[in-house]
Amino acid sequence: MDLQNKKMTEDAFFAQRKEVLATWHTGKDLSLEDGIAYQKTITGDKRFGEKLQKAAAERQTLTQPRAGVALPEEHIKLLRFLETEGEADLLPSTIDSYTRLNRYAEGDVGIEKSKETGRSMLNGFPAVNYGVEICRHVTSSVKNPVQVRHGTPDARLLTEITLAGGFTSFEGGAISYNIPYSKNHALEHTMTHWQYTDRLVGMYQEAGVSINREPFGPLTGTLVPPCISNAVAVIEALMAAEQGVRDITVGYGQCGNLIQDVAAMRSLRILARRYLDRFGFKDVKLTTVFHQWMGGFPQDEARAFGVISWGAAAAVLAKSTKVICKSPHEAMGIPTMEANAQGLRASKQVTSMLKDQDMTENPLVVIESDIIEQEVECILKKVEELGKGDFAVGAVHGFAAGAIDVPFAPSRVNMGKAMPARDNEGAIRFIEVGNLPFTDDLKKFHREKLEERAKTENRPVNFQMIIDDVYAIGKGFLVGRPEGTK
């Protein structure tokens, strides 16, 4: 394995860059110097990281949607609507699925079909197909900072074009945009691809341009125990920092139990800072993002607003720097811009109401946070051991050994032995720990928590609990109880 968690040399980077820029015609004449020069013209109020840092200092929680359509003018119209009618503090450009798979020719077909039909035939904005100038038109046409949000195992060309195009934040990571999204991508390959992305961001940083980087916290978004997502976030933060990234936002997807959600965010902040400092990255600016519920939603819009508001409440009580907002159309598919704006306003109402409240030092939160820390430390110590001190190599071996195991992930790399279920209060525990390197005390803790639920429901701890929990929120509950349970 050639993989190492070491900063790419300039020779290695620029040799690879020639190949990357040649993969689609919009990369052909792309100039790194021009991209840096253009980024330097973007004022502080349009810089993603600066707005996050200000919010963190003021202990505010900013709102951000997901959004993206095929045609530039329609995309601009959508973003403008979300920042005016939706009152979004931060804006996205969600990238289409063809771009995520580097199938740019099919993206071109989608653009043409969108023009013919008068509606978006792509599920996002095809930034690579359009190239730098149109990206600059998009980012300069709105008032707020814009982030690239996608799901791309190999995002090298996308990074090149969007950074030169004026986007000031880039989401994703080698693990979080592989394991939950892809079946066949080798982890060592996505590791090297994302080292390129992070090294490019590092080069902008070294030239005086700070680009925010955000690993994708929720992973599969389905009953992911906090220790798994937190461990992945720390590894991806370390890998980004090694390549020169100095502005990182670590994230987490809502599980639904308020104590556990606040504790997860608390422990994530502590652990990310601890590991960055330990490896000499004390100059990395660290912020957080909380994703509202990523699982099944109720079809009824009024009930969906309840789920959205609960996510906003958890985010602000955990003092997350920003919250990624859902819409009341979540159960139906891609929302209208009006529905997207409604989800944003509902979230804004809650974050504004609760902005002066802080649950992070609540005694129950601290206890749960300590448990999550212990679990994450078990995983990270094993990863470090497997990699002989190298977290990139260790992550590859860690997945192979099941020391990191993401529930319900499609990837062949993922062992899939660790299985989650909710305890009697709705916190996510492990019904099967698989090969996770937990202590006996931690294994006992999870077993006892689930046995407590089983006693309440008068049934054994079994796989049916998992199935019931997956569908519960869509049916109006957090814990998937059998009918007749009091």
Where do the language-model regions lie?
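Long alpha-helical, hydrophobic tracts
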Residues: 188, 205-338
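Flexible, glycine/charged-enriched surface loops at secondary-structure junctions
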Residues: 89-90, 208-210, 278-286, 323, ...
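Catalytic-core signal marking the mid-to-C-terminal active-site face
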Residues: 2-27, 47-52, 339-486
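Generic structural signal for well-ordered, non-membrane alpha-helical segments
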Residues: 75, 79, 124-131, 155, ...
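C-terminal helical cap(s) of enzyme catalytic domains, especially alpha/beta-barrels
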Residues: 103-113, 185-194, 265-269, 331-360
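Structural signal for hydrophobic packing residues in well-ordered secondary-structure cores
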Residues: 83-87, 138-142, 163-166, 170, ...
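Catalytic alpha/beta active-site cores
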Residues: 1-243, 247-251, 257, 442, ...
